[in-house]
């Protein structure tokens, strides 16, 4: 059985507003407005050939440019010109980017005469012109004879129509291949034909483009068979579409694919996922480049006016969504999800895109926020921060209005979430303060330690986070269990009457995101998947939260040994009941007491057998990751969402939430060197040169220890090393002393060591024997 591929429909919008319970009523109507999110560049290349002519501005003019007076194939015909319906501005046009269901497909009877095309009978399949071997032999002959006629005739015939494309590239031209499991396309032949195409003379390349135009003109009525889908599948892989001179044709190809019905998209998605990694990545990069160059063309005269091709980007985004869905169906994915990011979007007005997405509901106005997989995590962070800033301003403004209306003097403190805590009662004081000031959680955070002088310019806030996280995650505190094999924390399954401290951890993570603080927390990826299940707080309090579908792979991220044992159970070839002697009852230790739990009613009397072992593994995994910690995680979930009650959260993948909270694990020490500031040193000083020679030569584990020693975390903020504001200060002490770090300020105090050997020795000792909390 295949996995179903569904994309949200405009007719079934997602409810995407998140709010604290007291704010929820007022935002109910806003939630319904949001359009659905579809679940998922390089510069222009040179001309087709050295003799390539000027760029073509429109589809019809391109036809005129590439059509010779007479082709050898005299009985072939094509329309003299193409008339498309009037194109509205992109902000008014129904977005092709959204899922287009059967009812949205244009009815031929209801269409205008401009869009109608004659309904052709079922095609008679042409005879397959060549095999892969025949084609390769023709190409080899060209090298010796220089005669391209055979190759030219092949391209002329193959690309002239959809039936010819199927005849050439189907493994069996007469077979139906009406299955998602196999497109029926000979991928090796397609690759050989396209790899050769760019090395052919220009007239052959123009012949191919003319044939594609003819094919698209005939198929404007919409595909009727799987052979039509196969033709689209083949045409989309054409490397000629890397060139801006072909973008008019490429855009119409994308539009026809984008407007296919859901069932056809389902087939294409499963065919896409069976492409090689190389070919799949080429499709993605080509589409990203197309979007980038339409947004910021190097030569605007290359393209039609935006008002006449406003559908280009929505069409490309929809096809990208199909590829993104295909990528998500493969484990591991064909390419990293970050390869779908379009860095060009970092330079557009993302807040306008966000507000369009938020405010215009189902008015069919296109926004890139409907396709968050193309927006980088750095850009999403900007959206979240600006959205949170706007929320903070609105809350502060309301507080100011309330003060004035009561004839009270305004106080600057009303603009901040002011925390006053004692170091000796850090957890309890923090919990009390956050509980009392729930309405202020979205204000800018400022921390004061009772009995201590000091103005919080960011350092005290970071210190509060570091100390609080350090205490809560300590093994003696009992809230979280550290798993050495996986190097991560997980929720303790102990039962208690009050789970408020788990809520505190959730609030801390939310505050960290909104205040741009990177936390040294090690949760497994499945924690962030649960945190977005659902991504908004349900209006019905009876709906479970933090529950998601989990697998043995998720369990392996936390308890690899147990996951390995369950995998062995699933693959065991003997008699499971006799060899394992297990039942649907499991045991857990809580405060030194062993407790038993039935995975299903009467589980202690149900043996695990070869027939029910999959059910056992699924129930056991679900018990460990969902049911046994439900109350703990629910409190954690509500804490996080009480701060991050924003529609912007809908844009994030679980992996991106982790990066926002904990930072990225990818280190670039050269970037850190370029952005480092100095106090008492110059970057040309000998000690500084020694320092960077040593650090850049460190293995990755020591580089991570250095980062943890100086910043409190071995991860990098979303904005990169530059966002650390790393500083090296001169420590006027004996060179026998070790370096000192002030993690609150990302500062390293370095004595003026006289030799590289001495500096390296002292630095390794310092970073290897300290937890990095040089808090003074």
From Swiss-Prot:
Pfam families: HECT (PF00632)
Basic and acidic residues bias (residue ranges): 21-34
GO biological process, one term: protein polyubiquitination
Cited PANTHER family: HECT-TYPE E3 UBIQUITIN TRANSFERASE (PTHR45700:SF9), UBIQUITIN-PROTEIN LIGASE E3C (PTHR45700)
Protein name: Probable E3 ubiquitin-protein ligase HECTD2
Function description: E3 ubiquitin-protein ligase which accepts ubiquitin from an E2 ubiquitin-conjugating enzyme in the form of a thioester and then directly transfers the ubiquitin to targeted substrates.
Source organism of the structure: Pongo abelii
Gene Ontology molecular function: any one: ubiquitin protein ligase activity
Record's keyword annotation contains Phosphoprotein: yes
EC assignment: 2.3.2.26
Composition-biased stretches (Low complexity): 7-20
Region called Disordered, residue ranges: 1-46
Gene that encodes it: HECTD2
Reactions listed under catalytic activity: S-ubiquitinyl-[E2 ubiquitin-conjugating enzyme]-L-cysteine + [acceptor protein]-L-lysine = [E2 ubiquitin-conjugating enzyme]-L-cysteine + N(6)-ubiquitinyl-[acceptor protein]-L-lysine
Record: active site: 744
Every HECT domain range: 437-776
